[in-house]
Amino acid sequence: MSSSASQAPSPTKIRRVRKLRPKLTKIYAMLKIGGDLSLAEHLTVERIDFGEFGNSRPFRIRITNLFNGNSDYYYVKHADASRLFGLELEHILSPNRINYLVNGNTLIEEHIAGVPGDVFIRDHLPNPSINHVRIAKEFVKFGERCFLRLLGDMRTVNYVVDITPDFEEVQYRVRPIDFDQQSYEGNLQVYRAHLFPDNRPVEDLVREHLNDQTILQYRAEEHLQMSRRAKVERNRLKAVLTVMNRTEVAPQENLLGLREALVERYGSHAFEACETMGALTATHLQQVLNLTPARR
């Protein structure tokens, strides 16, 4: 991202930014503490960055606590349908909680902490002391989570790796950070994270350290966990999928392509009646969470 401080601002721009800063602080207070501004008087906007990559081209706001210098971030993005449904499905079906706000066409997302995927593969993966088996296991589970709920484009720039020291080993959790390809593409391969070339190093780890039976075991574990989460949040999930079914998420040609691919993959006619991406997503969840995992 490029920083707004990299160029000398004009006096007019300075006045606009000064006027904008308290509003940005208020948004942070709404996102994090429910809008109680009395608890946000010591917060300030330290920096505004502009994302020059990706479809969302977000603004990243850095909020700093004047008492202790601690900083946090949030993002301002365009609230398109795929991204909103992706956030909801991530919150409901994954082990991760998501915090965001929507107002009209504006989406406010909290920062998801972790090492960017490309940085993790470049700087952490070559470390001989790292537990490659645990990494391979987590990437299998991550890929399965994305595929089951049809979240696509999980290239290395679109996820982070959360590294947590445990009492004996280190735990790894892979988390998506961009959800604009939720149930959007017509090519089924886009939803299979391990097929992207920049994920090849971790896919090689999977093939090196996990046999087919173990891969199926980890995928079945993820199926069970997602099924349990879906049951706990059944009302919310039903509401999201109902709205998704009424929304034009993707072009018609994408719908037809994905529908044909799913029919071919599972040999099931249940997908043929689906007229929206929302219906395809709901049917895929229903079908797969009650099926023995198919081989990769």
Summary of predicted features, one role per range:
Residues N127-Q189:
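Conserved kinase catalytic-core segment
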Residues I92-S94, N105-E110, F142, D204-Q213:
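Short C-terminal domain-edge/linker segments immediately following a structured domain
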